[in-house]
C-alpha cells in the first residue's frame, strides 16, 4: 500500500509494516505468497514497472519476501518521452518487444490515466488492467481475476 493502509486487508490478516529507507511499506503476507506463486507459473513473465525502479528488487523484495529480485526493471530513463505517462510508453515497448499472448498490468494509478485506458481498450481481450485502491492494495479478487485471465 503506497499511501498506508486503510482498515484491514482482505487477505485474512492485518497489514504488516517495514521501513525501507525513509519509506514505510505496508503489505499483506498472503498477497506476497500469491504473487510468488503466480510468478512461478510456467509461461508467466513478471516485470517491475514502478517509480522505485531498481530499488524494488534490491530492497523491497528482501524486506517483504517477494521473489522478484530477478524480474526485469522497466526504467523511466529508458523511455523516449513520447507519451504523457512514462509507464504507458514502457509497457508498450515491453509488449512490442516480447509479444506475449496476454498481458496483465497492475498499477494503482492506472484507472486515472486516460491514454493508458484507451490503449488497453484498443488491445481488447489481450490485456487485463487492474487499478487497486492505493490504501488497500491488491485484493484477493484482483488475484482471482488475474488467474482467470491467464487460464482463459
Identify the residue ranges that each predicted region occupies.
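Alpha-helical substrate-recognition element adjacent to the catalytic core
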Residues: 1-84
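C-terminal cap/substrate-recognition subdomain and adjoining C-terminal extension
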Residues: 55-152
Amino acid at each position: 500500500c503506497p499511501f498506508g493502509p486503510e482498515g484491514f486487508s482482505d487477505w485474512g490478516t492485518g497489514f504488516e509494516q517495514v521501513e525501507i529507507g525513509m519509506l514505510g511499506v505496508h503489505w499483506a503476507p498472503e498477497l506476497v505468497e500469491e504473487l510468488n506463486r503466480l510468478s512461478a507459473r510456467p509461461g508467466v513473465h513478471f516485470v517491475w514497472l514502478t517509480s522505485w525502479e531498481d530499488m524494488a528488487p534490491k530492497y523491497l523484495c528482501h524486506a517483504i519476501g517477494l521473489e522478484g529480485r530477478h524480474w526485469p526493471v522497466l526504467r523511466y530513463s529508458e523511455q523516449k518521452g513520447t507519451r504523457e505517462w512514462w509507464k504507458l510508453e514502457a509497457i508498450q515497448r515491453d509488449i512490442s518487444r516480447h509479444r506475449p499472448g496476454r498481458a496483465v498490468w497492475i498499477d494503482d494509478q492506472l484507472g486515472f490515466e486516460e491514454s493508458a485506458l484507451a490503449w488497453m481498450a484498443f488491445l481488447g481481450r489481450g490485456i487485463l488492467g487492474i487499478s487497486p485502491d492505493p490504501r488497500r492494495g491488491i485484493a484477493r479478487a484482483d488475484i482471482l481475476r488475474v488467474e482467470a485471465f491467464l487460464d482463459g
